[in-house]
């Protein structure tokens, strides 16, 4: 425990802030190229095949990114836009692909409906407004 005179001379070191998405380097999004597109299984209580891709960003960093929505058209060498935001049940996945930009098409929507269009939360999945 320092004395008051020691604190006056030296001061305390400010706590360093640790960013949740370091590969973005203080940018809202980054462009990258898919190196590998694959599926992974989530952590213990959940069970699924989550669609993810390994992306080499424009700043030469390589990150794992989640592909949201139902169905996608991404493959190796697809150019994608990456935003921050982790997936809680996939360890090491701290980024999301932005749907509806660059090579990532908008999501098709829930397959349970007979017409495969997404009418709600469209902006999250890059889906255009339906005609009527």
From Swiss-Prot:
Q: Which InterPro entries match?
A: NA-bd_OB-fold, Ribosomal_uS12, Ribosomal_uS12_bac
Any Pfam family from its record, for instance, is: Ribosom_S12_S23
**Gene Ontology MF annotations:** rRNA binding; structural constituent of ribosome; tRNA binding
Report the superkingdom from the record. Bacteria
**Biological process (GO), any one:** translation
**Region described as Disordered: spans on this chain:** 101-132
List the record's Gene Ontology CC terms alphabetically: small ribosomal subunit
Q: In the record, which positions carry 3-methylthioaspartic acid?
A: 89
Q: Where is the composition biased (Basic residues)?
A: 117-132
Gene3D superfamilies cross-referenced by the UniProt entry: Nucleic acid-binding proteins
Q: Which UniProt keywords apply?
A: Methylation, Ribonucleoprotein, Ribosomal protein, RNA-binding, rRNA-binding, tRNA-binding
What CDD domains does this protein's entry cite? Answer: Ribosomal_S12
**Keyword RNA-binding belongs to the record:** yes
Q: Which family does it belong to?
A: Belongs to the universal ribosomal protein uS12 family.
PANTHER family attached to this UniProt entry: 30S RIBOSOMAL PROTEIN S12 FAMILY MEMBER
- Please give the function described in this protein's UniProt entry: With S4 and S5 plays an important role in translational accuracy.
How the protein assembles, per its UniProt entry?
Part of the 30S ribosomal subunit. Contacts proteins S8 and S17. May interact with IF1 in the 30S initiation complex.
Please give the name of this protein: Small ribosomal subunit protein uS12
Source organism per entry reads: Sorangium cellulosum (strain So ce56)
Gene name tied to this protein: rpsL
């Amino acid at each position: 425990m320092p004395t008051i005179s020691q604190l006056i001379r030296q001061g305390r070191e400010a706590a360093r802030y640790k960013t949740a998405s370091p590969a973005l380097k203080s940018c809202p999004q980054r462009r990258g190229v898919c190196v590998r597109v694959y599926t992974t299984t989530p952590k213990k209580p959940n069970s699924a095949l989550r669609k993810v891709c390994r992306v080499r960003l424009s700043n030469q960093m390589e990150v794992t990114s989640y592909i949201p929505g139902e169905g996608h058209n991404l493959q190796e060498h697809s150019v994608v836009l990456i935003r921050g935001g982790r997936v809680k049940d996939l360890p090491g996945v701290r980024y999301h692909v932005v749907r509806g930009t660059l090579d990532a098409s908008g999501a098709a929507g829930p397959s349970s409906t007979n017409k495969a269009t997404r009418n709600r939360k469209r902006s999250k999945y890059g889906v255009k407004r339906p005609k009527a």
